[in-house]
C-alpha cells in the first residue's frame, strides 16, 4: 500500500516495476510526447478531414508530436483520406493516434470504428494497416468493466499493438 499527504507518492511510486517481472519485451521504445485533439472542443462534428488537417498544423506550430483523431473517423473521414491525412501529418512532423470502439457484447455505443478491437484477426489486420500508413497509436474506448474477460482484452490489444509498434491509450476503462 502506498500512502502520503499528497498524490506524489502514489503517482511517483516504482513498486509495480520493482516487484513485477516484465512479461513482454517492447518492440520499440515507446514515447508518447505532447499531443492535441479536436474532440475536447468540437466533439463529433470536428472529426472531418479539414478540421483534422488544421489540428495537425496547430500541433506542428506548437511543437507537439501527435494529433488524436477521435470517434467516427472511419465514416466521417474514411480510410483513404486517413492515409492522406497521415502522410500530411508526417510531412509536418506530426503523427496520428486513431480512436477505436472496444466493442463486444458489453458495448452498444454507436461510435466507430466498431467490431475491430474485440476480434483478433480484424484487430491485427487494422494494426498492419496502421503500421503501413505510419499511424503512431490508438485510443480504445468504452470498456465494459473489470472482469477477467476485459483484462484479457486489454492484454490482447497490448500484445498485438506491440507486435506492430503501435502505442495504446485505454479510455473509458478501469
Where are the model-predicted features located?
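Aromatic- and carboxylate-enriched substrate-binding clefts and catalytic-loop regions
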Residues: 71-174
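Conserved structural scaffold segments of CAZyme catalytic domains across common CAZy folds
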Residues: 1-97, 103
